[in-house]
Amino acid sequence: MTAPERVGAGPGFAPGALTVHHHPDELAKVTRALRATGRRITLVPTMGALHEGHLELIRRARRDSNSVVVVSIFVNPLQFGPGEDFTSYPRTFETDVEACRAEGVELVFAPDRDDVYGPDPQITVHPGPLGDELEGASRPGHFAGVLTIVAKLLGIVRPDLALFGEKDYQQLVLIRRMARELNIDTAIQGIPIVRAPDGLALSSRNVYLSEEERGAALALSAALAAGAHAGREGAEAVLRAAREVLATEPLVRLDYLELRDTELGAAPAEGEARLLVAAKVGETRLIDNALVLLGDQGDSRP
């Protein structure tokens, strides 16, 4: 994999302007110098193909006027399995850089694969048992790849805060766990899912959907809403309501629909839970999730 074309790259850091860095040592030197002046660093990790969900992360990051926002753009090969879409994953680097510029981002980190991993990487971060459940059951090795690149980014950038979208909820839980258990001194914050007006969770992979498939994909968010609405009646009612919605859409091939607690253990009898769904619509694999309030606390809807 070759490095993205160097767009607007320049040495160091220019306040109020965008600087693109490609080598880890370059960026680490800049963020170290910024911290020495009392500036905070906030990291927004992405694989590019930026959409409104990513831009919301950036806007949240920029709310802290003392923080310099670093957006990383790197399509991480370690988190793609055989037969997945690493080669075809959307790459829109120049457009992404311009989107970052428009949002007031001052640092973009767009490294080459070899600069991140070296010629013969041997070490990965093991996600533990949760890494083999839900997404991990369908995508073996995926979360080892995710945690490894996130650990590397946190080590290179040394941010005070890193923001992740809640759409990849299992990923968020595992990253928080990694930071806690490995004593990584970065606060990990989840940002609520950004949805299209019709309810579809925004994803870079939505571009793969045909018009018909996109309509069918709305069954995922509709199922979550139905499940959340049934929360007062308990866990079985939540799952039953969601399954009934999914069963009405023949183009949706369900992978899993599960109700867990907020740390992705067994669902509680009452209180906050998370309803998670994954399905293929056509050839595109989509995931979504929603908070559910079980028992007398009422219902919650995506």
Swiss-Prot record:
Gene name per UniProt: panC
Subunit and interaction comment: Homodimer.
The name this protein goes by in its record: Pantothenate synthetase
Alphabetic keyword roster: ATP-binding, Cytoplasm, Ligase, Nucleotide-binding, Pantothenate biosynthesis
Gene3D superfamilies (alphabetical): HUPs, Pantoate-beta-alanine ligase, C-terminal domain
Places the protein is found: Cytoplasm
InterPro entries per record: Pantoate_ligase, Pantoate_ligase_C, Rossmann-like_a/b/a_fold
Pathway(s) annotated for this protein in UniProt: Cofactor biosynthesis; (R)-pantothenate biosynthesis; (R)-pantothenate from (R)-pantoate and beta-alanine: step 1/1
